[in-house]
Amino acid sequence: MKKKYILAIDQGTTSSRAILFDQKGHIAGMAQREFTQIFPQPGWVEHNPRDIMTSVYTTITELLNNTQIDVRAIAGIGITNQRETTVIWDRQTGQPIYNAIVWQSRQTKDICDQLTTAGYQDLVHAKTGLLIDAYFSGTKVKWILDHVENAHTQATRGELAFGTIDTWIIWNLTGGQVHVTDYSNASRTLLYDIHALRWDPDLLTMLDIPAAILPDVRSSSDIYGLTQTPYFHGEQIPIAGIAGDQQAALFGQACFEPGMAKNTYGTGCFMLMHTGKKAVESKNGLLTTIAWGLNGEIEYALEGSIFVAGSVVQWLRDGLRMFGKASDSQAYADRVSDNGGVYVVPAFVGLGAPYWRSDVRGAVFGLTRSTTKEHFIRAALESMAYQTRDVLSAMQADAGMELKELRTDGAAITNDFMAQFQSDILAVPVLRSEIAETTALGAAYLAGLATGFWSSREEITQHWAINLCFKPQMDKQQREHLYAGWKQAVAATLGFRVA
């Protein structure tokens, strides 16, 4: 049967999606399922790994039922995932020994503080391109092994397996036959040397993590194994692409040349700039990461990770109950001509790049008796744009490249107010992709290249199209005045301590 589709599994922080793409990179069908968020203590965020797999299986079933396609028409499967989120499971039973610790979770902050005090920061940065922070997988692995009875002993014996979410999904889809990750996900663990391309023994010793639990690291576009699950009606479909969500979005946005950049506005906000085959060391609080491994070559990126972006809109909706639907935020923001002097610094779980302060918490500044709900909502939306400028300033300084345009995707940037304000604050055009699901599309492209569904990156580039281009309209004086207010608000937030 003619292969007509690539299936992308996009496993995110709050939901899982299954998306079918056709030869032109257009969506032929999609299903989505949310799953439960677990908050055992303030600052802790966990998921039940079984809930994640249930959501994946449910979306696959729903997608196939709704589209009524023949499973044999699927050429391959690409997987993209929330990065850093950590699962450890029993190899024999396939059962997790603890909940998945989510990338947002700060429960390993004490471990990070101990490592920093012990002077490991330079070693970690030199080998991984990362910083010592609770964000990354390594300290989460240590926490689980230290807190689950007999876990360390089992790990040493090789009875346990560690994986980021891509690894966990592939293990389950292949019936426990394949324990693998790709370069992009490995580079986010705090355990992988991004220059030597190996799990690093010094880093494993630093965190007392047995090497026996680690997955194999492979190219981001490769045939890793075949599905062994009834959800595909007994068909064995090649799993052929893996990339962490942000690297997948960079690929889906066709940012294949050095200096090209994208920003994804999801739960967090993540800006990546392609730096080619050179790992650019950041001196300005950014991360150096592997973009992907492809055709025997490694390509790198600079990344600025913002912990709270779209989730600030969820907070306005669910926590403060300021509106009923996230999409309502645009109408409220448009009702006022400015932010009324209000700045929201959404450091709910600390501040990411370029500050890297996990100890600070959110703050609001500039409130007066005349402040309205509209001002507050507008200020919260603006915080995403200000944080992006913080990252871009650091990125341009590190890479020595000036950004010509910013390619964007994610739910928050579908808000026209947000997209225009982002362009105004950056003073560069903001391009919104025609296909919003660029993260899933990137995973699909990687799988399609491995299976021959697409022939080359040049073919992929021809598929990329703009939905809208937002050009700067704000004058420089106003732009710098607004940004100066943001910097003041951040400085005050950094100086505040909870008693």
Swiss-Prot record:
ADP binds at T13, R17, T267, G310, A411, N415. The keyword Membrane does not apply. ATP binds at T13, T14, S15, T267, G310, Q314, A411. Its EC number is 2.7.1.30. The keyword Kinase applies. Belongs to the FGGY kinase family. GO terms for biological process: glycerol catabolic process; glycerol metabolic process; glycerol-3-phosphate metabolic process. This is Glycerol kinase. Key enzyme in the regulation of glycerol uptake and metabolism. Catalyzes the phosphorylation of glycerol to yield sn-glycerol 3-phosphate.
